[in-house]
Amino acid sequence: MKNMLFIAVIIFNALRVSASQETLIHGNIESGGFGGPVFKMGNIYHEAALMIGGRGGWIINHQYMLGAGGYALVNEIPSKQWANYNMDLGYGGIELAYIQNPDKLTHLSFMILLGGGSVGFTEQGRDQWDESQDFDTFYIAEPGVNLILNVTQFFRLGLGGSYRFVKGVQGDSELVSKDLSGPTLVITLKFGTF
């Protein structure tokens, strides 16, 4: 009888502990996903810069996003050291986001990109892989905030800002990390199930 009572107490305590356990994501997990183009405008190396890329991700319970993104410089930024050379710049990484009130017509999302990239200067008219000057790689952390508009059930439009924190650029003579760091205006088109 004592053994039965002892076992009943242990089972009751185990059920009570498991019922009160707190987790970040609780209940049934709802999944969605999205992808789409991203346009970034800002200053790089004291010049106006336009970067185009894309991002995609897994949306968990309509509020958390785990994904990836990649971006490349599309306009010409000339070298200040070598005549007829323009900057080649690209970066990417994992992206994490929290989406606040995703069911509202307009809402905010807070995100961060953590990754790496490369930068160098390529002679005009030549492929970037032929010959680059002052080529280097770097680490990047880019936190941002976006105002999101729910256009349709499957389309979201975002307008926001981010800041590129770049570290590790140690070019021979022309570029340093602060030349690539700075604020950015971001326009995002997202297609998927949210």
Language-model region placement:
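Bacterial Sec-dependent N-terminal signal peptides
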Residues: 1-24
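Hydrophobic, lipid-facing positions within transmembrane beta-strands of outer-membrane proteins
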Residues: 33-35, 50-54, 64, 90-94, ...
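Transmembrane beta-barrel strands of outer-membrane/channel proteins
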Residues: 33-41, 54, 68-72, 110-118, ...
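Short glycine/proline- and aromatic-enriched beta-strand/turn motifs that initiate or cap beta-hairpins
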Residues: 17-66, 190-194
